[in-house]
Amino acid sequence: MAKSKNHTTHNQSRKWHRNGIKKPRSQRYESLKGVDPKFLRNMRFAKKHNKKGLKKMQANNAKAMSARAEAIKALVKPKEVKPKIPKGVSRKLDRLAYIAHPKLGKRARARIAKGLRLCRPKAKAKAKAKDQTKAQAAAPASVPAQAPKRTQAPTKASE
């Protein structure tokens, strides 16, 4: 069987320090030696319940906090609101609305332009295509036209 622990050391030091580790009573009020102990006791209670001082302290804290908040506000730039993706009625209109958006559409427009550039025929290919079309146009004029295969001769329609 496990031993039962009557005395715990858990959190004891925290408990001692919560109220401060106190000096012995004889040394507590060195500057007030020879003063009535009852008066000293009352003074302790007065310290605890000194509302006027507390209110002053709270007011000072509030001032300090507001000054700090203003300083932070001056340093930190306001955050921009993120633009939401515009919604259209249909998918096609959705896409158009997205492309037309001033910020969001930048990348989309760039991609579309790139795609168009890639699809466009190159200069050499253009020249080659022109040569081929010229050659094709010249070829049928010199060679007599042949009748296509599997065509039947026109027959007279019976009346």
From Swiss-Prot:
Keyword tags: Acetylation, Cytoplasm, Heparin-binding, Methylation, Phosphoprotein, Repeat, Ribonucleoprotein, Ribosomal protein
InterPro entries for this protein: Ribosomal_eL29
Record localization: Cytoplasm
Compositionally biased spans, kind Basic residues: 1-26, 117-127
Skewed-composition ranges (Low complexity): 134-149
Top-rank lineage group of the source organism: Eukaryota
Gene Ontology biological process terms, A to Z: cytoplasmic translation; embryo implantation; translation
Family from the record: Belongs to the eukaryotic ribosomal protein eL29 family.
Protein name, entry field: Large ribosomal subunit protein eL29
Natural source organism: Homo sapiens
The organism's taxonomic lineage, starting at the top: Eukaryota, Metazoa, Chordata, Craniata, Vertebrata
Name of the gene this protein is made from: RPL29
